[in-house]
Amino acid sequence: MASIRRTLSFSERHQKLVDINYCKKLHVEALQRLQNQTRDQMVQNENDDRAERKRFLRLLQDEQFELDMEEAIQKAEENKRLRELQLAQEEKLATELAKLKRESLKDEKLRQQVRENSAELRELEKKLKAAYMNKERAAQIAEKDAIKYGQMKRDAEIARTMMEEHERLIKEESAAEDKRNQAKAQYSHDLEKQLEEQGKKKQEAYEQLLKEKLMIDEIVRKIYEEDQLERQQRLEKMNTTRRYIEEFQKEQALWRKKKREEMEEENRKIIEFAKLQQQREEDRMAKVQEKVKKKRLQLKNMLTQRLEEMLRQREDLEQVRQELYQEEQAEIYKKKLEEEAEEKLRKQKELKQDFMDQMALKELILQAAKEEEETFRKAMLAKFAEDDRIELMNAQKPRMKQLEHKRAVEKLIEERRNQFLADKQRELEEWQWQQRRQGCINAIVEEERLKLLKEHATKLLGYLPKGVFKNEDDIDMLGEEFRKAYQKRSEICEK
């Protein structure tokens, strides 16, 4: 029994061990199942999370799409609003441009009417046209003066050419005279040379004579030596020969002296002739130079006189033209002043007459209005009284009706008075509008006047008549350079 228990115990232990192992196995399986479940749950959770994320992303995408669509719709509406605003602005701008264009055309038409109807602008245009005519006339006069000056210049050039030709002829004559003088000098030189040669020949003849004398002396000596014995006999002959020789020597000396005197006289005559010729030539050249100087001075005086005469004629013509122009401008200015004074007096009379007529008309209108009001009041009162008399029978009601009628009449009179005042106010506003329009016209006239001055005054400096500039501001408006030139021109005209 004990062994059985022990066996059982062993079996139990074994069973227990098996149970334990089985339990462990079950526990492991349970753990595996739990792990599988956990893993499946995690996978499921992951799938759910993934689906949730996808759903959330889809929701976000849907919301983003809705936001994008809403933003696109807003942008489209904003673009539509901007396009409508732009179209409205463009339409407004086009309207403004059309309005400005209409106003510009209206202003241009008004300016055209003012230019056509303004007496001041017409007068200024007449003055500018007159200034252009004066400028053209001055240009023609300057052209004529230039032609005259060119003719004078050509005459002076011809005179200068004639003088140069005359001087050239004088130089040629002087050169020819110099050649003649040189020929004369050469002739004198040749003559002196011939005289010198003659003197040499005479000297040679004298030397030959001396040689002959020496030969004679030698012959005499030889004769004396050879025939000393015959000296006594030949003494006379020798004395005669000596006397002959002495006479010959005397004659030779006299002939030499005479020849020398003749040569000196001839040289003196030649020198005197040369001096005389030189003096004559100097006198002739002096006379020629004096004649040339006289002709040159005469021509110069003639040209100077012609220039002075032409300048004097030009100055006289310019002075006459200036005097005529000044007289004409003075007459025009005087006539203009008279016309302006007459126009001013006429306008004053017209304004005074208009004022008196307006006052009289106003009195008549007021009187007529009062009379009409009184007549109307009486007529209405009579009408209302007649109506009330017919309609009403008791004494209290006519009194009340009379008061009502009086108030009605006064109301009608007040309405008529208000209508009258409204008409007068409208007339006043119309008069003020006319005044503003006249002021605008005056401003346009002034602008057009200044525009004409800016366009033409600088081109017509020196030719503008009096009265073109109203005051110094018109001159200053054209610039400092124009003002200085105009003042300088005015000072020259005053001088």
UniProtKB/Swiss-Prot annotation:
Region of interest (Interaction with BBOF1), residue spans? 1-315
- What UniProt keywords apply to this chain's record, in alphabetical order? Cell projection, Cilium, Coiled coil, Cytoplasm, Cytoskeleton, Flagellum, Meiosis, Nucleus
Q: Which InterPro entries match?
A: MNS1 (IPR026504), TPH_dom (IPR043597)
Q: State where the protein is found.
A: Nucleus; Cytoplasm, Cytoskeleton, Cilium axoneme; Cytoplasm, Cytoskeleton, Flagellum axoneme
Provide the primary localization: nucleus
| Biological process per Gene Ontology, one example term | meiotic cell cycle
Q: What does the record say about tissue specificity?
A: Expressed in trachea multiciliated cells.
Would the keyword Zinc-finger be found if you checked this record's keyword annotation?
no
Q: What's this chain's function? A: Microtubule inner protein (MIP) part of the dynein-decorated doublet microtubules (DMTs) in cilia axoneme, which is required for motile cilia beating. May play a role in the control of meiotic division and germ cell differentiation through regulation of pairing and recombination during meiosis. Required for sperm flagella assembly. May play a role in the assembly and function of the outer dynein arm-docking complex (ODA-DC). ODA-DC mediates outer dynein arms (ODA) binding onto the axonemal doublet microtubules.
Q: How does it assemble?
A: Able to form oligomers. Microtubule inner protein component of sperm flagellar doublet microtubules. Interacts with ODAD1. Interacts with BBOF1.
- The name of this protein is Meiosis-specific nuclear structural protein 1
Give the species this sequence originates from.
Bos taurus
